[in-house]
Amino acid sequence: ACLDIGNSCRED
């Protein structure tokens, strides 16, 4: 899944 962190994306 991709978590929206600010203006970027972090896969968790």
Swiss-Prot record:
Could you name the domain of life of the organism this protein comes from? Eukaryota
Major localisation: secreted
This protein's record includes keyword Mitochondrion:
no
Q: GO terms for CC?
A: extracellular region
Q: Does the keyword Transferase apply?
A: no
This protein's UniProt keywords: Neurotoxin, Secreted, Toxin
A GO molecular function assigned to this protein is: toxin activity
Tissues in which the protein is found? Expressed by the venom gland.
What are the subcellular locations of this protein? Secreted
Which function does this protein serve? Neurotoxin.
Family label: Belongs to the neurotoxin 09 (Tx3-6) family.
> What protein name is recorded for this chain?
U7-ctenitoxin-Co1a
Q: Record the organism.
A: Ctenus ornatus (Brazilian spider)
**UniProt lineage:** Eukaryota, Metazoa, Ecdysozoa, Arthropoda, Chelicerata
